[in-house]
Amino acid sequence: MDTWLANEQSDDSSDDGEASGDTEMDFLRNLFSKTLGISGEKVLDELTLEGVASYIQSGKCKNIICMVGAGISTSAGIPDFRSPDTGLYANLQKYNLPYPEAIFQIDYFKKHPEPFFALARELYPGQFKPTVCHYFIKLLKDKGLLKRCYSQNIDTLERVAGLEGEDLIEAHGTFYTSHCVSFMCRKEYDLDWMKEKIFSDDIPKCDKCSNLVKPDIVFFGENLPKRFFTSMAMDFPRCDLLIIMGTSLQVQPFAALVGRVSNSCPRLLINLEKAGGADPLLGIISIGGGMDFDSAKAYRREAITFT
């Protein structure tokens, strides 16, 4: 697994010819730095994992946010979604779907729930154990350093590792609870109830109204939990270290979270590939728009790689 650091400011300087041609851009960057209150003071002593560890131990780092995706659970035996040969979407032929994503489409589910619940039997929480990544996040909590963990995962392994509901924002929902799909009912069911139904080959139906019961995972066509948005607005301005692990950062609005920390907040990406690239338009003025690892003009970010 590779590691990239997106830090607050680069010490690199352009040669004289290039610098003279970028006078206007430098002026704009300086203007935005002053306007936005971006400090030129370095946060990390060095752009290495040792530098990050030193910062965490310094006492200055008190509000760490982790953003995690399916990549932190693959070593537990749970497939990710998009890997070409081993990913979930590449291995759904047996369900005779019109297209792979249909298994997580709410309209398709209401008409054809069988494929989803067949898949759920294979991936159901309780069959897998947390990985070192999950326990690292729990360690941050135990040390009083974790502000919140924002997870795209529905496998509940963060909870198994010891995180409480307050520690977690399960952006794409969870198997932990389920609800009747009827807006007139919405009766809630717990994990054990759903597990019994799934492993008895029954399509879960509501005891009260006989409509389908669906785990509280977010399907395509459904809104993200309200708590995702309310917590996001409170948490990210206070974040002083953002750790991103095991996500391609392709799904919005989760992917946009990387741009919500302050411009002085170090961002550490631990991934098999670079992700969360900067938006070209916002990148011109060096604010927001994701992470810029490769641009020669990047004033805020540098990258290092470990294999």
Model-based region annotation:
Residues 1-307:
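Conserved catalytic core of sirtuin-type NAD+-dependent deacylases
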